[in-house]
Curated annotation (Swiss-Prot):
Membrane-crossing segments per the record: 5-25, 92-112, 117-137, 153-173, 191-211, 253-273, 284-304, 307-327
Annotated protein name in UniProt: Heme A synthase
Organism of derivation: Rickettsia bellii (strain RML369-C)
Top EC class for this record: oxidoreductase
Family affiliation: Belongs to the COX15/CtaA family. Type 2 subfamily.
Length: 336
């Protein structure tokens, strides 16, 4: 039955990642405000007939985004953005069901023990918070300024990442062998760097969501400098101000600084793993190197080519891949 538990956790992880990626595409295509109602139960089916599509389109037209951004949009164009948002919401519902129904089964079968159930309940509560946060985010854009709050967008993403983190950590603990290393070998440094890397990846994902929410990737499309300067001229004289977090230039600059910081931390982690001279940790170091390289490359490509959807989605996906490898590393060290 432990194999079934492992398969379930893996399925949940895949579903959460799919939800994150589709959510990212929804943001990149400005589709998030196409469904102007929150119907958790009755909204599981899309419009089928011409009349129901027209009714949904009429609801959309009643909100500012249509007149301010998409005035003159055809029904076919509306269907595209509507279905993207619909698939994103449907994935959220499906992921919740795929999580809760087997959870009940595994608990009453005794596969999930009482000592472990609290952490699973926390994940369940996070799913509920995530659903509410998604609508709270959408609601922020159904106003005179038709753009969702970039802060709410970032928290919506971070909650999904926390859910993935908790599920993936359980998956790794459930299916990976422990690390057999002599007790005299000190793993304190790799452990510290792995914790620091996880924390920095969270910061970067949050900053990346702010960049997406402010369309900050569409300015200063050069690398490594911003308009010929390391620090862009717009923020040199006003660096410490909360208002900067509403400024696309500032947010992009901080996201770049985060990328440099994360690279240093992950490289330090890789070096500390290689010094242990353990085959399994060497493998982790190799995967970390590949994940970091691809993540940095997709980030630069996304910037230089004005945020193409494929590159931006790959950049988001490899942030999750990099996080996964670091969580795997942390689990191996912590449980050795």
């Amino acid at each position: 039955m432990q194999k079934n538990l492992t398969r379930w956790l893996l399925t949940c992880c895949i579903m959460v990642v799919a939800m994150i990626i589709v959510g990212g595409i929804t943001r990149l295509t400005d589709s998030g405000l196409s469904i102007v109602e929150w119907r958790p139960v009755t909204g599981i089916l899309p419009p089928f007939s011409y009349d129901t599509w027209q009714a949904e389109f009429a609801k959309y037209k009643a909100f500012p985004e249509y007149n301010a951004v998409n005035y003159g949009m055809t029904l076919s164009e509306f269907k595209f953005i509507y279905l993207l948002e619909f698939v994103h919401r449907l994935l959220g519902r499906a992921t919740g069901l795929i999580y809760i129904l087997p959870l009940i089964y595994f608990y009453f079968k005794g596969i999930i023990k009482n000592r472990d159930i609290l952490s699973y309940i926390i994940v369940l509560l996070l799913f509920c918070v995530q659903g509410f946060m998604g609508w709270y985010m959408v609601k922020s854009g159904l106003v005179n300024h038709p753009s969702v709050s970039h802060f709410r967008l970032a928290f919506h993403l971070i909650i999904a990442v926390i859910i993935y983190h908790l599920l993936f950590y359980k998956l790794v603990k459930n299916c990976c062998d422990i690390l057999l290393i002599p007790s005299q070998i000190n793993l304190k440094l790799p452990l510290i760097f792995s914790v620091a890397a996880i924390a920095m990846i969270y910061v970067q994902i949050f900053l990346g969501a702010l960049v997406a929410g402010l369309d900050a990737g569409l300015i200063y499309n050069s690398f490594p400098l911003m308009g010929g300067n390391f620090i862009p001229i717009e923020i040199k004289d006003n660096f410490i101000s909360f208002k900067n977090w509403y400024d696309p230039v500032f947010v992009q600059f901080i996201h770049r600084l985060g990328a440099y910081s994360l690279s240093i931390i992950v490289i330090a982690l890789i070096i500390s793993l290689l010094k242990v001279k353990n085959p399994k940790l060497n493998k982790v170091a190799f995967y970390l190197s590949i994940a970091l390289l691809i993540q940095l490359s997709t980030g630069v490509i996304t910037l230089l080519y004005h945020v193409p959807i494929i590159a931006a989605s790959m950049h988001q996906f490899f942030a999750i891949v990099l996080l996964s490898v670091v969580i795997w590393c942390y689990s191996l060290i912590k449980n050795s």
